[in-house]
């Protein structure tokens, strides 16, 4: 693998923050910020696909977001539904596979059906995987993985002493995908907000002051360039990493 290819993250995860503040700054209702954020999603997908990123995970709706005003939650659900129906064909035409992770049980049946339809419609995509986290929380993900393993133990298919970090990781919602190499958060906040808690253990973190609707092509390329200039050590010394790169 050439050096430039090594500098490209296989998996990028993004916390899309700042939609409401973007709208408030313009004296617009909060949902206007979320609608504007769809354009940023398209831009980031384009940059990731052209750069060689294999997986992009977007934090669209957290399990804590249900605590927001009912009117805002309702508007977000309508936006999610319309975006799924509108964008599925675009993703299919661009050979992009859509996956949705999270607890779907709380969503309206119509939205759950739209999720399944969009995933089926784009299932043949081979260029790129777009993973959307909806009603997702990192703690929920670890708990559901533990429950899956507990059922295997209860059924006699697995011994407790055989449970390893690798086995638990495989039971996470993202289990069959590479771990995120880079996690980006927009909006100026410096926290991960219960997003991919297990998976981000060794991810590089990148924080942008831009609100999500303003985070487009140039901003995404800047984040990827920053990643390319970092040295990922995974517990090793700089000297060890440099020696391995030369060998």
Regions found by a protein language model. Give the residues of each.
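Flexible, compositionally biased loop and terminal segments
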Residues: 1-247
